[in-house]
């Protein structure tokens, strides 16, 4: 069963994260937090099919996977995620595969979410956006982002020392009008 193997894999990720301490924060959100976020972001969308979820800082992919527990059609979830760290990107891809997610329902990218918007093709707005971005990380906040559709309507950029705020704006940009976003912030 894919879920049993996938759950075992997530358990091992959690054990590794516990042993890695603070450094693990870049790829792991505790299961209790992940479940609460999934339950909240699925409220009112339980019957939606297909359901598109996006995590622009996907880490291990657990935030996206947990949404299935709260949807009537869990096999119609499409997963869209991006991760900067290549090793962590591969960890997430393996996590989704071990949970039985078909490659047709996986749209993952290894890249810098804030530096270059992704995804830029359909679908680029989602039923749910979930994320646990790196806390108070730095980002370029270059003037070119003032004309970036994700940020331009605000007329001002997140400070260079507050990438978490830029992630929040990125999430709003990719959220459907009827969608729900869950984000872990300091």
List where the protein language model places each region:
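Conserved phosphate/pyrophosphate-binding and hydrolysis machinery centered on Walker-type P-loop NTPases
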Residues: 2-6, 23-31, 161
């Amino acid at each position: 069963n894919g879920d049993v193997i996938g759950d075992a894999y997530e358990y091992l990720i959690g054990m590794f994260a516990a042993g890695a301490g603070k450094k693990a924060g870049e790829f792991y959100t505790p299961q209790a937090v992940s479940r609460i976020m999934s339950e909240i972001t699925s409220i009112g969308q339980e019957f939606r099919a297909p359901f598109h979820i996006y995590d622009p800082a996907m880490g291990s992919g657990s935030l996206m996977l947990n949404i299935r527990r709260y949807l009537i059609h869990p096999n119609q979830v499409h997963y869209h995620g991006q991760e900067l760290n290549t090793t962590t990107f591969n960890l997430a891809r393996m996590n989704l595969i071990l949970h039985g997610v078909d490659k047709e329902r996986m749209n993952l990218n290894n890249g810098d979410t804030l530096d270059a918007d992704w995804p830029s093709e359909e679908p680029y707005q989602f039923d749910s956006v979930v994320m646990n971005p790196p806390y108070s990380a730095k980002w370029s906040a270059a003037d070119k982002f003032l004309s970036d559709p994700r940020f331009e309507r605000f007329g001002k950029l997140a400070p260079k020392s507050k990438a978490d705020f830029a992630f929040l704006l990125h999430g709003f940009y990719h959220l459907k009008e009827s969608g729900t976003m869950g984000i872990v912030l300091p």
